[in-house]
Amino acid sequence: LATAPRVPGFTVLDAAVMVDQWRTGDPDNRMLNPDQWQRVGALLAGLTPVQRASLDDLLAAAGSSTQRALLLSTLASGATIEQVRFVADAIRSKSDAEIVRMLALNTDEPTGRTGATYDGAPVIQDPTTGNTCGSTSLLGLVARVDPMLALWLTSGQRAPGWNPPYLAHLTDAQWRGTTFLERFIAAQHSVLTTTDSDLSTWVEAVGTPPWGAAALASLGSSTTYESVLYDDQDPELTRELMSRAAAAANNGTPVPFYVGDDHVPRHVMLITGYADGYYTVYEPGSGSVTRVPESVMLGTGKPDAFGGWAHIDYLVLPVT
């Protein structure tokens, strides 16, 4: 701590967390993205001395810099000090690897043919309806930046007073779901209703519209998103957009993207990282996590990684 830089609005402990996180070799493993850090700075400035002292105590008691970063991420999501304390108690015994796995819903590492699982359950969209791929991808996005969501989905532990607008359509019984998959599928349908009815006018049966996805991603995170039409017949545009997607995912802001045929978007997937010419992509239909070559994402390679569809139609990107 003695060598940590002094940053206006941040204590030495805060700055130490920032330095440690930015030294992480793989940027995908950073706990907070730049937008979250900006939000943290603004929120810290608004805390009362008593609140700030309570937060400092929680940060000092955390078992690792990853746990401290998680608590600041919780604060960035809009949590109260009481909610931050709840999360601190819930993750106190978790290892750094378990925390990363919780936030990513275990969808960060390539899975091969088996698909991602959490506590033995597949991390997939509702197989009975076929229209929650968008909301599933959005949950994968928001869980990375809202530890209270990730904690509830993976363990059923709900922070006091936590009731985000995108989960407002859950019943009491659904809030008390006993398994990861029960809670995950219930949350998918609440998000679907939110994007289609609360945030846009859309037919729920056909899934989440790109603009609804952008609105919910902005609502559930510290980042403002926009939906962008993707034309794979325009090489300059596709390269620009995929470069934005790679940079965003590597900054900790995953990117939903829509795939389909020549005319209509049919499915939604999630870009979670980029390295060495490959995009890490989560496909909610099967739960698979694959490394997709850049040539495929640019529309110049075999499109066998798009859930059976041939083209990218939309990207939901952070506003630059």
Feature-to-residue mapping (PLM):
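Generic N-terminal leader/targeting and pre-domain segments
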Residues: 1-68, 77
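Short amphipathic alpha-helical segments that mediate assembly, nucleic-acid/protein binding
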Residues: 12-15, 36-40, 51-55, 67-68, ...
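Noncatalytic regulatory segments and standalone regulatory/sensor domains
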Residues: 32, 40, 47, 55-63, ...
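Active-site nucleophile-adjacent alpha helix/oxyanion-hole segment immediately C-terminal to the catalytic cysteine
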Residues: 35, 86-196, 256
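Active-site nucleophilic cysteine motif
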Residues: 126-143, 203-216, 267
